[in-house]
């Protein structure tokens, strides 16, 4: 069932891409379908957001230092 749905989506996008002559979009679509078949797209969302939060905290500290060093006008 899953394979049939993915193939149907692929064919619809293929027809739309050919109609719009957007051939540069097709390689990424084919790569996405192959990785979906192989199951590489399954990732945990929690691990993706943790490094970004650390970066945000570091940037916040850097901004506080920058504002502390700025002269008051």
Swiss-Prot record:
GO terms for cellular component: extracellular region; membrane; other organism cell membrane. Residues 1-22 form the signal peptide. It is found in: Secreted; Target cell membrane. Residues 44-73 form a propeptide. The modification Lysine amide is found at residue 38. Its main location: secreted. Keywords: Amidation, Antibiotic, Antimicrobial, Cleavage on pair of basic residues, Membrane, Secreted, Signal, Target cell membrane, Target membrane, Transmembrane. It comes from the Eukaryota. Expressed by the venom gland. One of its GO terms (biological process) is defense response to bacterium. Cationic host defense peptide that have antibacterial activity by breaking membranes. Is more effective on Gram-positive than on Gram-negative bacteria. Belongs to the non-disulfide-bridged peptide (NDBP) superfamily. Short antimicrobial peptide (group 4) family. This is Mucroporin-like peptide. It comes from Lychas mucronatus (Chinese swimming scorpion). The lineage of its organism: Eukaryota, Metazoa, Ecdysozoa, Arthropoda, Chelicerata.
């Amino acid at each position: 069932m899953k394979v049939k749905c993915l193939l149907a989506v692929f064919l619809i996008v293929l027809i739309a891409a050919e109609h719009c002559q957007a051939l540069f979009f097709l390689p990424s679509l084919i790569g996405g379908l192959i990785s979906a078949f192989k199951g590489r797209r399954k990732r945990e969302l929690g691990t993706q957001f943790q490094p970004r939060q650390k970066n945000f905290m570091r940037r916040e500290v850097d901004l506080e230092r920058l504002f502390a060093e700025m002269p008051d006008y």
